[in-house]
Amino acid sequence: MTRTYAFLEMGMVYDWIVIGNGLTGSAVSYELAANGQTVLLVDRHGSPQGATRFSYGGIAYWSGTTPLLKQLCQESQEQYPQLSAELDYDIQFRELDLVLTVADDDDPAAYTDRCSQYLVAPTQLSIDEALDLEPMLNRSALSGAFTTKHGNVKPEELIAGYNNAFKRLGGAIAIAQVKGFQRQGDRLTGILTDQGTFSGANVLVSNGALARSLLRDSGIHISQCFSHAELIETPPLEHQLRTIVMPMNIQRFALEATAGAPETDALWDEDGHEVVPPILDTGAVQFLDGTIRFGQISRALTDPDAVIDAAQSEQDMRDAVGYVLPELKDVTGTWHRCLVSFCGDRLPLIGPIPSTDGLHIFSGFSNPFAILPPLAKRYAAHVSGDPDDIITRLSPDRPSLKLT
């Protein structure tokens, strides 16, 4: 993917420096620029390499369960259909049928109460109805299923759309490795990189799973964790998935709640811990170009460079996905791993970091595609003079992240 970057003024003092050009950084940098701020977006890679690059791109705006999340999901559902036009870029947004599979040794009735809590309750399906929606499913692997409409984008195209619109608004992008922060007394005045020093009135950390270690190296603590997500990506295939397939009993959220609890927070400042055992959520999505991503394994390992047996992981995912979607078991594909940030209370960290003037964070999204675009818009308006109670409630200093 070829991109041209806006002119970078080395001596300029930007209103905002945004660290990280994944989904979070690309969205919030665009919204800040749209609010009239001068913005520098910094990332060590010239194209997406992290969690967004290997995401399914699923937009679960049906899945809000609290008043806050339901409101954000509703805003997201309204925002996405207009986003390609707003950005003047095809982000490949579409709505697909989502099939939530219930395993053959499980009981669909166990999920009816959970469904009633969602903003849009998934509809229960018989096995025959599930196969009508997705013929690639293995009848023997199911005791039932649920369905609802699910948004989807090509993640890399969404980033490219935000970046291109950002540059048209005068935003600048630097490919640089952030090494630390420039300070004047108790206030941050910029960042130190392998390409030099960049100055800014505010620094916004949006580099996902790497945010904690970057801040820790400067003596700053945040309660954000990460998982190692593993999946398999194929080249364009003739196989045609009609739907997005995911398990009804998604285990990743329980892993995040336990691994991100205040009681385990200190472990994340030490390498070598497996905070909770790994899980495997069997799912798959096919993009418009024919490529398929399926998996996924999630591991709560505190070392971002932890050694993982890729061959065994790939076999485990192929076996699991091959049971539910047999045609995918032996397709050509490559194992990938990325780091996925999260917070134990399933809400992101947004706002100023206490004790360090000029330093802010926008990170830790557990369900990013569903809630991030409206929060990026709200945050940019909030820091541009339009106070927002929702942004205030997502402070990195909020009580739900602390031991009681």
Residue ranges, per PLM feature:
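Short hydrophobic core segments
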Residues: 17-19, 198-210, 376
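Glycine-rich FAD pyrophosphate-binding loop
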Residues: 34-53
